[in-house]
């Protein structure tokens, strides 16, 4: 097994496909995806284009359709929900399909959708993701951060490091053999430095500060928790994620 960490979708190499690819957007798309599926949502369907989302969701039964739209940390006008995991209660999302478009997370999922296995990961479901990968033993694993509009993000990197660290311990493979690139080693080092205080790291991150300015303090606390959800969001067909 080789693990490659890519800080943003733009860094994913062209012309090659990983056996297993993981999209990470801790603040907040993949955290919200995991939370919604754990709460009983039927599926999450992701879009980069809002007009396409609206057109596709219009074909779905209204009572089982939830439009999730976020731009710049705020709910898109006319949508049912923004990108907060706290909106994803069982009462609200059970048996529903969430049609989702966010600033960053949907881009990373679309960038890796041709991989054999595509997973959405966050800190909240880190161990479920790591256990699945350890069981499946894919030859190549990509962990792709969403970043912020093409730039690096601390929160996605530390989550990538958390997943890689779990696999490092589970497999017993030496780090120099498990890591496919320097970014993997750096991500693990970041996680080791902050694993006892992940909330502090998220509060220092530029997107964390952006959300704090929008009074999303509780979202940051929730998103900084590790291994609280035993759910594995897996791509069923391009752009559609279900609980495995």
Curated annotation (Swiss-Prot):
InterPro entries: ComB-like (IPR005238), ComB-like_sf (IPR036702). Keywords: Hydrolase, Magnesium. It comes from the Bacteria. It catalyses: (2R)-O-phospho-3-sulfolactate + H2O = (2R)-3-sulfolactate + phosphate. GO terms for molecular function: 2-phosphosulfolactate phosphatase activity; magnesium ion binding; sulfopyruvate decarboxylase activity. Its EC number is 3.1.3.71. Its cofactor is Mg(2+). The keyword Cytoplasm does not apply. Pfam families: 2-ph_phosp. Belongs to the ComB family. NCBIfam families: PRK00886.1-5. PANTHER family: 2-PHOSPHOSULFOLACTATE PHOSPHATASE-RELATED (PTHR37311:SF1). This is Probable 2-phosphosulfolactate phosphatase.
